[in-house]
Amino acid sequence: MKVIFLEDVRGKGKKGQVKDVPDGYAQNFLIKNGKAKPATTAAVSALKGQQHAEAKNAAAELAEAKVLKTKIEDDKTIVEVKSKAGEDSRLFGSIPSKQIAQALEQQYKIKVDKRKIDLPEPIKALGYRNVDVRIHPDVTATIRVHIVAE
């Protein structure tokens, strides 16, 4: 019997996959527990339509991420963060990714989640830094951050 998996079933199939399984297994376990449904022509065409829509949305997200990357990596986009510093240009405390995200939103109206800003360690000195931002799993942008003393 052909079924469409509604969720991942270990050793049998992944969500959205159409597969031929034994009749008893399909009727008594997969369909009964809501893990799969019979693969009728209507169900298969609906699945293909859904997969097509998901692919279209993924392509739109990727295009949007690339536009945002060009906006972030523009030469004029330098995020300025002010912090208290000592005489040897070391900061009192540090600059975390949250503060960089807030400054980016205030200065350029670009909203980026703080978890997407990739700081190996917090910034602890004045000056310019290049910071990576993971906008999309396939798109990473680099922003210039200028740390200045208050």
From Swiss-Prot:
**What GO biological process term is on the record, naming one?**
translation
The similarity comment for this entry is: Belongs to the bacterial ribosomal protein bL9 family.
Q: Name one GO molecular function term.
A: structural constituent of ribosome
Q: Which HAMAP family match?
A: Ribosomal_bL9
InterPro entries named among the record's database cross-references: Ribosomal_bL9, Ribosomal_bL9/RNase_H1_N, Ribosomal_bL9_bac/chp, Ribosomal_bL9_C, Ribosomal_bL9_C_sf, Ribosomal_bL9_N, Ribosomal_bL9_N_sf
Please state the gene responsible for encoding this protein. Answer: rplI
Supply the name of the protein: Large ribosomal subunit protein bL9
| Summary of the function given for this chain in its UniProt record | Binds to the 23S rRNA.
Q: Which UniProt keywords apply?
A: Ribonucleoprotein, Ribosomal protein, RNA-binding, rRNA-binding
Name the Pfam families on file. Ribosomal_L9_C, Ribosomal_L9_N
Q: Which GO terms describe its cellular component?
A: ribonucleoprotein complex; ribosome
